[in-house]
Amino acid sequence: QTCALPISRFHGACEGGLCAHSLNVYRVLHGTFFTPDEDSEETFAICALLHDLCKANFYKKGTRNVKNEATGQWEKVPSYSVEDMFPYGHGEKSVFLIERFMKLKVEEAVAIRWHMGGFDDAVRGGSFALSGAFEKYPLAVKLHIADLEATYLLEQRGE
């Protein structure tokens, strides 16, 4: 999935982008880390496919002005912006939304909560809970790695 808008600097900020990203994360998570006798197919699917549920209805279509290099004229081009209608965090928002419809296992909730790893606002603010989560729940590390690989190695990002 390539998000064709040149100004979609947020990964997955295009029609179908969230679904495509979630499927990529699932493919990486399952293909790289799944061990049939130890892991649950359902848990891997839930974590990979729903980790970014917080981004549903998160991007708003709009336009912005960009100067045309050839003509020197300003032109309106399609763009996406963030419109966070429910400012509840990122991973924690996904967990909250999922649990309105289904009960997560602790391992699933922790993996989804901390899938952003060191990019999470709580970590950047000085929280040390991430290291405890990664030590106690290996699935959290695996989901984070799968998300990174999908985002930076499989998917193309706009400028």
Where are these regions (language model features)?
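Short, small-residue-biased leader/transition segments that mark boundaries at the very start
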Residues: 2-5
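Divalent metal-dependent catalytic cores for phosphoryl transfer on phosphate-bearing substrates
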Residues: 10-12, 16, 20, 27, ...
